[in-house]
Amino acid sequence: MGPLDVWDLSPLLSLWMNRFYIYMGCALGLTLCICVQIIKKQVTRSQEKRVPGAPDSSLSPQKKQTHVSGVKIFYGSQTGTAKGFAVVLAKAVTSLDLPVAIINLKEYDPDDSLIGEITSKTVCAFLVATYTDGCPTESAEWFCKWLEESANDFRFGKTYLKGLRYAVFGLGDSAYRSHFNKVSTNVDKWLWMLGAQRVLTRGEGDCNAVQSKHGSIEADFTAWKTKFISRLQALQRGEKKACGGNCKRGKCESAQHGPGEARPHPQGELHPGDAEEEEPCESSSEDELGTQDYQSLTSVVDVEDLGNIMNPVKREKREKSHQDGKAAMQRNPEKTEDGEGRAMITPALREALTKQGYQLIGSHSGVKLCRWTKSMLRGRGGCYKHTFYGIESHRCMEATPSLACANKCVFCWRHHTNPVGTEWRWKMDQPELILKEAIENHQNMIKQFKGVPGLKAERFEEGMEVKHCALSLVGEPIMYPEINRLLKLLHQHGISSFLVTNAQFPEEIRKLTPVTQLYVSVDASTRDGLKKIDRPLFKDFWQRFLDSLKALSAKQQRTVYRLTLVKCWNVDELQAYAELVSLGNPDFIEVKGVTYCGESAASSLTMANVPWHEEVVRFVRELVDLLPDYEVACEHEHSNCLLIGHKKFKIDGEWWTWINYSRFQELVLQYEESGGSKTFSSRDYMARTPQWALFGARERGFDPKDTRYQRKNKTKDISGC
């Protein structure tokens, strides 16, 4: 009997026949095992999430970073409420073991210190009250004025305060609905416009208990304070998410407005995203398409259906455009019903220029406080006119009787917000009104400077008495039909006159009464170059330009060519510049590097077009080599500017580029009393130039009587006057 005969194969046969059940059982067991492992991992993860502050054991103590170095609480208070809130907030911050400082905005100089808060990892809290007529309190007035001007000043840019973390709480009264918490809204907006990072939605405290969200202003502050402390704790942990994460274009509001959340502004404003700060557009999608069409376009649309949607849209747009055109013609006639021309300053223009710091006068004039006026009031140096001609910058009023201009220069300071034209077609104000209000507005702006850190009392008193007037603010002053009467009024008030024209009105130059100093802008040496840079409105602009230079040569008073160098645009063809000099024979030639005006759709200039001071010096030296009657006289390095003087002002080896202003007033008075028969020349009222103002001096044009101020950031200052 063989071995196979005694071996029973029935068990194996049974397993083989039931193999499918065995496979299914193994698969089921494996599946259950995997499910158990997954569930265990999920339970472990959920337990870890319940301890958000648990330290990461993988990080060594040496690798931990400090995300918040401290908190600075700034307050602007009139009755002491904001100051009291600052003390309460400081106590709460101290509980987090963070250094805290309470600062009165009246004693804080943002020009010197605010940018320093960026690198210090400090969180800044601003508690500001709205006072009479929506204005800031006296203690916060200067800070708010500086912040507004900086936010609307192209030289600061949109990233000036990038990295600064801040939160704002406002104190107001909703009974004054139109001004409710206006100051805190503006501070929040201006900080955002300068690139600062908002860490918490703006809080609003309401003194009106009936309307207060939490029953009182104290309760409003307590709710905001709780949120602020919570945000600080998150920042300490390194969380970088700002606010509620729903900020768009400066509008800061939470998705859900629960207890303690800041309300949207009653008027629904977008803080820095206001209409005037957004890119211009014709209308919104809702306006163009209608509600139903707009809603349909928010979903997926078949290509074949686009025609059915777009045809009504185009028809609506044409009808709307036609209606708007008719309305515009009815709104804007060339003359008003009483026969007078339209006002040059429209509501939109008034709003734009007011934001830029202008004080507008009547219907076509304006005055603005120059940055160099502010600088000299604080003993920080004067402008290049102080170095070249001896004007007292803190007593200089910068104004214009005409905001309109005949050119659209690529380096225009105001991005062409002012109107343009080739003739006067607007309503005209009398020169007496212009001068009176210009002086009053200038004095009011000087008064607002009182209390600013570093202000010199004696210069403040002197600044209240205007001694010089620079008619060069913006626009074309010589377009004003009564410019001669205005100049005579200036001289009668003992104010010297510095008039700038863009060389497009030769006949007006010939008729011009004597001025202290007459400037002509020479922005290019060739026809094509002038067209490219100045973009004049006149078709015969080049002939007008040449005729203006010839008219300048006939003037007996001081005349100046003003050359603005734009690298890669007008720094070549020196011989052509020399020929233009021989055409007008100016007493002086100012050569200045262009000031970068920021990005603009109207200009293609970039920082690459701004020449360095060394490049301006080299250009001046090469130009003087072609002008046998001229030499380099003065330099003002800070303004990137040099002065070329005619040799007739160099007497016995000494330059006499400064002006004897009292002597000029005597001469112009004699001229007027004689009916114009008793004339005088530029050499009759010249004064000796001090050594520090000369080219090659160690001071580089900075008056040693003042103290030079260097900004904390090391970026080279190429800003102008």
Curated annotation (Swiss-Prot):
Pathway(s) this gene product operates in, as recorded in its UniProt entry: tRNA modification; wybutosine-tRNA(Phe) biosynthesis
Record family assignment: Belongs to the TYW1 family.
Domain of life: Eukaryota
Entries under Pfam families matching the protein: Flavodoxin_1, Radical_SAM, Wyosine_form
Residues of the Radical SAM core domain: 389-635
Biased composition (Acidic residues): 275-290
Coiled coil: none
Domain Flavodoxin-like: 71-229
Enzyme nomenclature, EC number: 4.1.3.44
CDD domains: Radical_SAM (cd01335)
Binding sites annotated in the UniProt record for FMN: 77-81, 168-200
Residue ranges, compositional bias (Basic and acidic residues): 250-274, 313-325
Cofactor note: Binds 1 [4Fe-4S] cluster. The cluster is coordinated with 3 cysteines and an exchangeable S-adenosyl-L-methionine.
Keywords: 4Fe-4S, Iron, Iron-sulfur, Lyase, Metal-binding, Nucleotide-binding, S-adenosyl-L-methionine, tRNA processing
Protein name per Swiss-Prot or TrEMBL: S-adenosyl-L-methionine-dependent tRNA 4-demethylwyosine synthase TYW1
Name of the gene: Tyw1
GO MF annotation list: 4 iron, 4 sulfur cluster binding; FMN binding; metal ion binding; tRNA-4-demethylwyosine synthase activity
Region of interest (Disordered), ranges: 242-291, 305-339
Function: Probable component of the wybutosine biosynthesis pathway. Wybutosine is a hyper modified guanosine with a tricyclic base found at the 3'-position adjacent to the anticodon of eukaryotic phenylalanine tRNA. Catalyzes the condensation of N-methylguanine with 2 carbon atoms from pyruvate to form the tricyclic 4-demethylwyosine, an intermediate in wybutosine biosynthesis.
GO biological process: tRNA processing
InterPro entries with a match to the protein in the record: Aldolase_TIM, Flavdoxin-like, Flavodoxin/NO_synth, Flavoprotein-like_sf, rSAM, tRNA_wybutosine-synth, tRNA_wybutosine-synthase
Cofactor dependency: [4Fe-4S] cluster
